[in-house]
């Protein structure tokens, strides 16, 4: 039975749009990467769903990569066994071929627009485009303000965090879980586990459980787990275990979750707004290792951060509504049968490579 996993390549944050699209698949080892071009409402999601559905039915594992602007829409699909992928290559993702045709290639869905009809809608298209771009600007202003308040809290808590005690605890975990050598090459695949969206925070912990039945839950409200997870990641890859490293959506250089599928072990961060819903194998209470002095001030900052993030989410909802209107303008003038036929052609090509 095909194994299905779900992640994100993009995320909304206090620093704007965070982008891992260049890491969808390493072009040095990939066989085929389709980069979809075409504007709003042209059927990129339809195309990718068709590819994913066909490969699932053929028994291949499929990784779905969801959109932070609309977590019900796809930004990409990966077929690991074929070393193949397809992704949305339009703004803000801006994916371009590195080895054109030999490895990665464009698939132009823009040709399925009815050009004269679309040009007749230019006024509406421009209005809705400006509306959703303005809404994203407001969202990122609010999220930036929320992040600044949050960083003050993190800095204050960090001063009282018992780093040595945390390191000892993780050293014991590392000794128990990382034994022997893996069968991989120590490859690191980076994915966001979720994102802040117009529906609020969306986290795909289902993928953690699909890949790793043993889960260590790290209670970490103040961003102290990053160096500990980095050490685990380094030791795992040194021992040739392939890992999926899920960075923070606010700081992609800092790890929040680490999955080691060959061992069936995962380490996930749990905090307000990102609570692990399952039953962990073990819970590591990092919050208990810090002793900030002014807890009332921390609670006030937490409320302020929450209010500002809610304003950001409201703006993301406005952006989603404006983008839906924009797609609604285009949809009547898209040849969706042509899009599906192109998807079927490409899916057939993928199936031929399975033989």
Model-derived regions: residue spans:
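GST-like fold's C-terminal all-alpha helical module
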Residues: 348-355
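Rhodanese-like catalytic fold shared by cysteine-dependent sulfurtransferases
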Residues: 73, 89, 173-180, 184, ...
